[in-house]
Amino acid sequence: FGPEMICGIAKIDGLLVGIVANKQGLLMNYPEYKENSVGVGGKLYRQGLIKMNEFVTLCARDRIPMIWIQDTTGIDVGDDAEVAELLGLGQSLIYSIQNSDLPMMEITLRKGTAAAHYVLGGPQGNDTNAFSIGTAATEINVMNGETAAAAMYTGKLVREKKAGKDLGPTIDKMNAMINDYNEKSKPAFCAKMGFVDEIVKMPALRNYVLAFTDAAYQNPEKICPIHQMLLPRIIRDEK
């Protein structure tokens, strides 16, 4: 259920932590609301959003701090996605995160795109975020430059081509927009604008995870005794 997302409990320095992470790769015959489809890891679909929502709720019940590890290209879009109510499920996940009152840490390993970045524990949509970490490969944006340029100028290119006009000036504007988007999604810019609190080397990530976990368990207002009283659970498919 929700194969694009990994949700589970881990022990860090002997302490329980909830982990949510994107899973990469092709997902055959998925999502279920599209016939003969092939899902792409890193994108969020209906089941994955439901899965994360329930996992956040369970972590909140047992007062288990959470770490979000994201490499996402966004939430699925299109008519089928609208019918599957992905927007509402994303809103529900944000609501659950906000009301969990759990200390959370977010790591953007590579891509953090659009609303998926927010619902995966991103600081822009999470008041409980203790801090966010980026890497040398981090890119955070609303969409990539090529997509933005195509959305902005495709119609104009079609009209100019029909009119027999020179396409060069419009293509130059598209390239300029792509370059601007690329520059403003680089790690240094993300840190400068506060999208992440710090850019760290990959081997150093564990130290930050340890520091967050140890700090979370020293806060009596966030942790209660039942956090060790876990019961076996499973997130079931609707079928």
Outline where the language-model segments fall.
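Ligand-binding clefts of soluble mixed alpha/beta catalytic domains
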Residues: 1-239
